[in-house]
A protein has these predicted regions:
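Basic/charged alpha-beta structural segments of nucleotide/phosphate-handling enzymes
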Residues: 2-144, 159, 166, 180-186
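Histidine-anchored nucleotide/phosphate-binding helix
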Residues: 157-173
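Conserved P-loop NTPase "ATPase switch" module shared by AAA+ and STAND
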Residues: 145-158
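Structural recognition of the conserved hydrophobic beta-strand(s) that form the central parallel beta-sheet
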Residues: 150-151, 174-179
């Protein structure tokens, strides 16, 4: 046999935007671009810096550190497929004063942040990735590809990745290779 003529496309599931043209196709054209992560941290840090915790002003380094934590929380809510709607409601009104500070932080990312992102015509990177993967699932369910699709090494820990794995398993040439399974002899 001869030499291979073309290498397979092997994108990483975490970098959905990186392989848009060949894999995701036109689904991403309707979505706003992902906001730069550093810009998001800096915008949130500015919002946080105007706050006080326990009556003390938040310093710029503290604001940046807290903005990173808020971004992580925002990403985790998006990755889980959950909604932030009820998160602030878990804090009872009759708890200690410091819970009010926590509620202020939650208000920044769940009430003020969506408006800021909309004004800038961008969306959170994790949310965009989840929507792109969902669009790819819809596309493959309606028009299964004629070529093999293999997902290797993913545990499906994120809801969007799990949905993609289920879609790939239903494809005529879809395969999932789970990480860490011992080699088993065929009999």
């Amino acid at each position: 046999a001869g030499q291979p003529l073309m290498l397979p496309a092997m994108p990483a599931l975490g970098d959905v935007d990186e392989f848009l043209p060949g894999i995701i196709g036109a689904q991403g054209d309707d979505l706003p671009p992902a906001m730069d992560r550093v810009e998001r941290h800096l915008i949130l840090a500015r919002l946080i810096q105007g706050m006080t915790i326990g009556g003390r002003a938040i310093s710029p380094p503290q604001a940046l550190s807290l903005s990173i934590s808020l971004c992580t929380l925002l990403d985790q809510v998006s990755q889980s497929g959950g909604s932030p709607d009820g998160l602030a409601d878990i804090i009872p009104d009759d708890f200690a004063h410091h819970w009010g500070d926590i509620r202020q932080f939650l208000d920044i990312i769940f009430q003020r942040w969506p408006d800021i992102a909309a004004q800038k015509h961008v969306m959170d990177p994790v949310q965009r990735s989840a929507l792109l993967l969902s669009a790819q699932c819809d596309e493959w369910q309606q028009n299964p590809p004629a070529h093999p699709v293999i997902i290797a090494g993913s545990t499906g820990s994120l809801s969007s990745t799990r949905a993609l794995m289920k879609t790939v398993m239903a494809l005529p040439q879809g395969f999932i290779v789970l990480p860490g399974l011992p080699e088993m002899p065929f009999s």
